[in-house]
Amino acid sequence: MKVSVAALSCLMLVTALGSQAQVTNDAETGFMMSKLSLANSEVLDSFHAINADCCTSYIPGSIPCSLLESYLETSSKCPKPGVIFLTKNGRRLCVSPSNKQVLACRIMLKLATRIKTRKN
């Protein structure tokens, strides 16, 4: 009984300290980001590129080009090259840039964008 009470107490203490550490870390990150100068936009661009616009893995299989709305190439700062397709329903799909179908879809999207631009 004493062992289970001690284990439960220890677990509660670890949980409380862990959540406090997360709050402190979030506050420090926000503070440091607010101290970055907007003139140093390369740092911010790198921060966002690594977190948002890098592919950590590629989706398997093929993607119908008709489901795609746009694309962007990942930054050279990313650990892995990639193309991120945005689907018409808002999903982001990471694909290998060396895939032949990816190249075909990119060409199709470029042509569609040019046609839309000329109509306006």
Curated annotation (Swiss-Prot):
One GO biological process term: positive regulation of cell migration
Secretion signal, residue range per the UniProt entry: 1-21
Annotated compartments: Secreted
Pfam families per the UniProt record, alphabetical: IL8 (PF00048)
Bridged cysteine pairs (disulfide): C54-C78, C55-C94, C65-C105
Single annotated GO MF: CCR chemokine receptor binding
Main location: secreted
Keywords on record: Chemotaxis, Cytokine, Disulfide bond, Heparin-binding, Inflammatory response, Secreted, Signal
CC annotations in GO: extracellular space
InterPro entries per UniProt: Chemokine_b/g/d, Chemokine_CC_CS, Chemokine_IL8-like_dom, Interleukin_8-like_sf
This protein's record includes keyword Lipid biosynthesis: no
UniProt record similarity statement: Belongs to the intercrine beta (chemokine CC) family.
Primary role: Shows chemotactic activity for monocytes, resting T-lymphocytes, and neutrophils, but not for activated lymphocytes. Inhibits proliferation of myeloid progenitor cells in colony formation assays. This protein can bind heparin. Binds CCR1.
Protein name: C-C motif chemokine 23
